[in-house]
Amino acid sequence: MTKPLGMNSSFNVARPDFALIAAWVKPGSKVLDLGCGDGSLIRFLRDSRGARGYGVEIDDANVLACFNNGVNVIQSDLESGLQSFESGSFDYVVLSQTLQAVKNTENIIKEMLRVSKEGIVSFPNFGYWKNRLQVLSGHMPVSEALPYQWFDTPNIHNCTLGDFEEFCGQHGAHILERRVMSGNHQIRFMPNLLGMLAFYRFEQQK
């Protein structure tokens, strides 16, 4: 979920994770971004992959920013916004750094796979070693990926890589590809301990 734009702000510079997501999107694909913020990801996919993009966003300021920047957006809560789409409407549905704030995780993943061929999610890895140290010291983690204090955080379902992969196995989601990052570096060794952000591409179990 990207940050809101002010009325006089220029369009957000693409986040480093956008390039990773774009690498998984085939040129010319139809993409839906849930909780799209100001539409930065959709615009990046349109410009870099020729994607036909749409967003779902509830915040008034972000919806206006999407319109001002030529991004198609539907104003709706992301957890109910998928109900208006027919099955197989998209090639990809993206949930970028928002999974941990979703109330009904099971339903959102199910709906993502109903309306698209593939789902793409990214989320902060709660098993990251710095998070573990903060918990060990008696505090909830606060970091670049988890910037909120315990009392004002929207994050209600933090998880680790192992948690998400177990969830997928139990809910009919077949993982096609995984990338784990710390800053701009891909983590291959002990990713559940050393990785800050996790990215998954998945499809309905066949």
What residue ranges belong to the model's regions?
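Short conserved loop adjoining the S-adenosyl-L-methionine
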Residues: 81-87
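Glycine-rich SAM-binding Motif I of class I
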Residues: 39-43
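A short SAM/SAH-binding and catalytic strip from SAM-dependent methyltransferases
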Residues: 92-103
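Class I SAM-dependent methyltransferase Rossmann-like catalytic core
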Residues: 2-14
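S-adenosyl-L-methionine-dependent methyltransferase catalytic module, highlighting the catalytic core
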Residues: 106-111, 118-206
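Class I SAM-dependent methyltransferase SAM/SAH-binding core
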Residues: 44-81
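Class I SAM-dependent methyltransferase "Motif I" SAM/SAH-binding loop
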Residues: 35-37
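Conserved alpha-helix/loop element of class I SAM-dependent methyltransferases that forms part
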Residues: 12-28
